UniProtKB/Swiss-Prot annotation:
One of its GO terms (biological process) is adenine salvage. The gene is apt. Keywords: Cytoplasm, Glycosyltransferase, Purine salvage, Transferase. This is Adenine phosphoribosyltransferase. GO terms for cellular component: cytoplasm. It comes from Marinobacter nauticus (strain ATCC 700491 / DSM 11845 / VT8) (Marinobacter aquaeolei).
Length: 180
């Protein structure tokens, strides 16, 4: 996967000191705007999951929707949206998670999966892992099987991937940015 990883990593714009001093923001819009880079990104995921008979791609609000919809289409899988609380119109399951200063919640329609469905959970980036971990709890409550948690970018210094692995989850990221 080095072919995909290096070219995608180079296409990601780093914005220093945004949204606050000391933060290096990883801007994925440059990947999305570059049709070759975006194709390579989706191909990286498709090559990984092709032939695994994935039933659904669960995509995390909001940038995960971009990657998740393209991946679901390519895998001939359904697309399930993991939304911020209050955004889904039908009966939902809700899971709270900790933020640096407070809590947040994600939700899922209670009929989003069938028990035993094979699911890939996708987002743009793994930082602390809180949102992804909350989403995995929702998916498991419905009885679906999480094949893997996947993202374009890993920020390993923030510990999210490690936290997800400690919960017994397989984690795949296309590229990572350490220490900066």
């Amino acid at each position: 996967m080095d072919y995909f990883s290096e070219s995608i990593k180079k296409a990601i714009r780093t914005v220093p000191d945004w949204p606050k001093p000391g933060v290096s923001f990883r801007d994925i819009t440059t990947v999305l705007q570059d049709k070759t880079a975006f194709r390579k990104l989706i191909d990286a995921f498709v090559h990984r999951y092709h032939g695994q008979h994935i039933d659904a791609v669960a995509a995390v609000d909001a940038r995960g929707f971009i990657i998740g919809s393209a991946l679901a289409y390519e895998l001939n899988a359904s697309l399930v949206l993991v939304r911020k609380k209050g955004k889904l119109p039908f009966d939902t399951l809700v899971e709270d998670y900790e933020l640096e200063y407070g809590t947040a919640s994600v939700e899922l329609h209670e009929d989003a999966f069938k028990p035993g469905d094979k699911v890939i959970l996708v987002d743009d980036l793994i930082a602390t892992g809180g949102t992804m971990l909350a989403a995995t709890r929702l998916i498991r409550r419905i009885g679906a099987e999480i094949v893997e948690v996947a993202a374009m970018i890993d920020l390993p210094d923030l510990g999210g991937s490690r936290k997800l692995q400690e919960e017994g989850l397989q984690v795949y990221t296309v590229c990572s940015f350490e220490g900066d």
